[in-house]
Structure formats: structure tokens, C-alpha cells
Regions:
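Divalent-metal-activated hydrolytic enzyme cores
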Residues: 2-39, 74-76, 86-91, 106-203
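Short, hydrophobic/glycine-enriched beta-strand segments
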Residues: 17, 43-47, 95
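Conserved beta-strand-loop surface patch within small alpha/beta domains used
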Residues: 28-82
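Ordered, amphipathic secondary-structure segments that act as subunit-interaction surfaces
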Residues: 91-104
Length: 203
């Protein structure tokens, strides 16, 4: 879990590192500026924002290959579906993946825990064997009670739930297959969720 950094020092270090990396990237950018807007391989991935996951590596992507939509948990939220609909309707993707992962942070809390932590303080919380704890510094907000945080109880069930939500959405055509997988953080392997892929097959 994150430590309590002194923001001004931490962010300036990160900012410098990012800008330095970008300069290196620019120097080796080559002809990427000529890439077409639609993804060349015509598929999209919905996956988690977890920093341990690199879809470009685990799915063999280069710039311009595919759309990668990321949020906490890789959940089929309204905004994720908005992006998927744009992905096919305007940019031509024809196959979609829902990829959750093992040891996901979204399994460590629920809506009540999150809203209570936010009501206590807006500072970063910590977790130990006894659960989540707030530092209780500064003010909190009760606005978290009005958000569905889309937490996860069990990965197989959550992948199936998200595939079904996508397939049943009125803006999603029936001829787009949706594949359900779990990324194994300890090995890098993609493990199929057969019931999810079956639910996501072309009608």
C-alpha cells in the first residue's frame, strides 16, 4: 500500500522522470505519427488499471494495434461501455476481451468500507491484517455513499457479470464476441473463464 509521501517532492521527482522518458521516446518515435486512427487489429481490451498489468506485453500489442480501456477492476461500467461502443461504432473493432486479474485490490473492500473511509478523511488509507484504517487527518466527504464502486467478491463471477452486461447492452451488436479471461499475476498467464466466453459468443 502507498506510503504518505510529501507530495511536492514526490511529484517533482515523478514529473522529471516522466518528461525524461518522453524525451527518449520522442527521439525514437520513428513513423508512429503516420498510424491510422482505427486500431489495426480491430479488437479492444477492457482490463484493470493495476500497475502490475501491462496489456501491451501480455497481449502482444504495439502502438496502433488495439484499444485498451482501463479502470479499477476492469469493470463494465457505464463509461467503459461508452468507450466500447465508440470503439466499434466509429473505429471498427470486431472482438472484445474482458480481462480481470488475480490478487485484485477491488476484492479488498466493499461499497460500505469505501464510503466510510471517505467520510472519515480524504487522505490515503492503509490496510493490515485487521482491515482498512484511516489516518483521520483533514476533512472527509459523504459523497462516496452515492457511488457504486463496483467491487469484486470473486473473479470468475465478476468476469461473467461484466461479459453479460456488455452483451446484453442495447447499444452492443450481437455479432461482436466478448471473451472472458483472468490474468494470473504470479505467472503472467491469461486463464479463460469458459462460462464468460460462452456467454459472450456471437448470437
Amino acid at each position: 500500500m502507498p506510503n504518505n509521501y510529501k507530495n511536492e517532492n514526490f511529484m517533482s521527482k515523478i514529473l522529471n522522470e516522466v518528461l525524461s522518458a518522453n524525451r527518449d521516446y520522442v527521439n525514437n518515435f520513428g513513423d508512429k505519427g503516420e498510424l491510422a486512427l482505427p486500431p489495426a487489429r480491430q479488437f479492444a481490451i477492457l482490463t484493470c488499471m493495476d500497475a502490475r498489468l501491462d496489456p501491451a506485453k501480455y497481449a502482444g500489442l504495439s502502438e496502433g494495434d488495439a484499444h485498451v480501456i482501463r479502470n479499477a477492476g476492469g469493470r463494465a461500467s457505464d463509461d467503459a461501455i461508452r468507450s466500447l461502443v465508440i470503439s466499434y461504432k466509429l473505429l471498427g473493432t470486431r472482438e472484445w476481451f474482458v480481462i480481470h486479474h488475480t490478487n485484485c485490490g477491488m476484492e479488498l473492500f466493499n461499497n460500505e468500507i469505501m464510503s466510510d473511509l471517505l467520510a472519515s478523511s480524504l487522505k490515503t488509507a492503509s490496510i493490515d491484517e485487521n482491515g482498512w484504517h484511516d489516518c483521520c487527518e483533514g476533512h472527509g466527504s459523504t459523497e462516496g455513499r452515492y457511488i457504486n464502486w463496483l467491487t469484486i467478491k470473486e473473479q470468475t463471477a465478476s468476469v461473467l457479470e461484466d461479459v453479460l452486461r456488455i452483451k446484453n447492452h442495447p447499444l452492443v451488436p450481437s455479432d461482436i464476441p466478448v471473451y472472458g479471461y483472468i490474468y494470473e499475476c504470479t505467472t503472467g498467464r491469461l486463464i479463460e473463464v469458459p462460462e464468460a466466453t460462452a456467454a459472450g459468443k456471437v448470437a
